[in-house]
Every structure is written in C-alpha cells, then in structure tokens.
Amino acid sequence: LPCFKCKSCREGNYATCENYDYYGSRRDGGMTEYIAVKRWNLVKMPSGLSYDEGAMCEPVSVARHAVGKLNISKGESVFISGAGPIGLIAGQWAVLLGAKKVYYTDIDKRKLEFAKTLGFYEWENGTVTDCALEGTGYSNALQKCLETVKPHGRMVLMGNPAGEVTMSQNTYWQILRKELCINGTWNSSYNDVINDWHESIKAMADGELNVKPLITHKFPLSECNTAFKMMKNKTEFYNKVILNMQGAD
C-alpha cells in the first residue's frame, strides 16, 4: 500500500515508499476469509494454478527480487545462507537464471537435508562461490557469506534481522580486500515496467518454478492456533505452512 506521493513512489519504486502500509503486517486483515482491497492490489491467477501456489506468490516475488540483484551469469555458483521457504525459492530462481550449483548453510540440519532433496548442495568448508545471498539477518551468517564469495564477487543482503548485527574487523576487511559489490533488497518490484508478482505467477503457471514441495503443512483456518503453536514450538519439521480457507486437503 504505497502512498504514491513520495519520491520513491513517483519513480515507481513502491517498495521503498517512505509511508507504505501493508495488509497483514502494519494493517489488519491479511488473515481474514474475505478482505476488500483496491484493484491495484490484485494479481490475476491464471487457470490451472492452484490456490496453494497462488498463496506462495508473495515469497516467490520477494525471492525473485533479491536474486535478480545478484546478476547471475550462466554457469556461476551461488551461496545462500538460510534454507527456509524464501531461501529455497531463491535457489530455484538462481537455477532459472543460469546458476550451475546452489549451496546452502543453515543451523537446522533438517533444512539442509530438505534442500538436498530439491537438488541443492550443502556448503562445505573451503567452497568458494561467485555470489552470495544472505537470508537470515544474523551476524555469523553475514560473515560466512563474506568468507565464501570470491574476490570481485556479488552479494545481496535479504535477511531481516531480529536484533543487532555486528561486524568484526576481519569481516569488514573481507569487503575491502575482495572489492565486493553488496546490495540490499526489500520486498519486491511491482510497477508497470518491472513486476515481480506477474513474473512469479507466470513462472509457476508455466512450470518453471515448483513451489508445491515447499508446502509441508496445510491447516484449515479453524486450526490456525494449532499451526502457530507447532511453528512456535518447532514440534516437527516444517518449511511452508498454508492456512486453507476452504479446509485443509
């Protein structure tokens, strides 16, 4: 919900709006069965695309926006810290854009095993990559990215930190001595020229991007508290949890 008035909005960069709002985050309504929104906020789902896939459009768009900033060339290798839903979707986008291998690190070994079932690789000590995507917002993950990427490599910071992020002198040196190019990323692009949402819907509809394996759990809305409790207490492994307004399949 951009303001359409600030400099960023006038340039079509709505994600960096100075006054933007958000359904389900800054504004209530994102988890209601029905919500009235302006037509501008809608993305038409093509026939053949399931509601589950449609529900994944937002993380797919965020991942596309981030990976696009890596400027991946055919045959390059990519390192991603964080094997959560957006991180794994980012890996798929990286492959679509030409990456030969995508490596992951994560503190949860189950996530790494899950990533390997999707055709990705667990990062091993000493592996150097052409570019890196930081997807956790933690200091040690940032350091690992800087250590892993090659000299003159590219790096994108995507992880939203829950606390302070610190950097040691040695970590800072990695940026200087490798002459790294580092970009930030926030949300997605959705203007008339670049629209990550439209491209994401198209990629899923065309079968280029498969998000179905990432959906590990589905709950009816009436059991949302059960879903939240499972996620909070981590009583079982999950990747992406869907609340189905029509009842879980």
At which residue positions do the language-model features occur?
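C-terminal substrate-binding/catalytic core of Rossmann-like NAD(P)-dependent dehydrogenases/reductases
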Residues: V165-I215, N225-T226
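Local beta-strand N-terminus motif with an aromatic residue
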Residues: G75, V128-D130, V211, C224
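Mid-domain Rossmann-like dinucleotide-binding core that forms the NAD(H)/NADP(H) cofactor-binding site
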Residues: L49-N125
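Short acidic-hydrophobic, aromatic-tinged amphipathic segments that line or gate anion-handling sites
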Residues: Y121-N125, K218-E223
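C-terminal capping/lid region of NAD(P)-dependent oxidoreductase domains
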Residues: V156-V165, L180, D206-H217, N225-D249
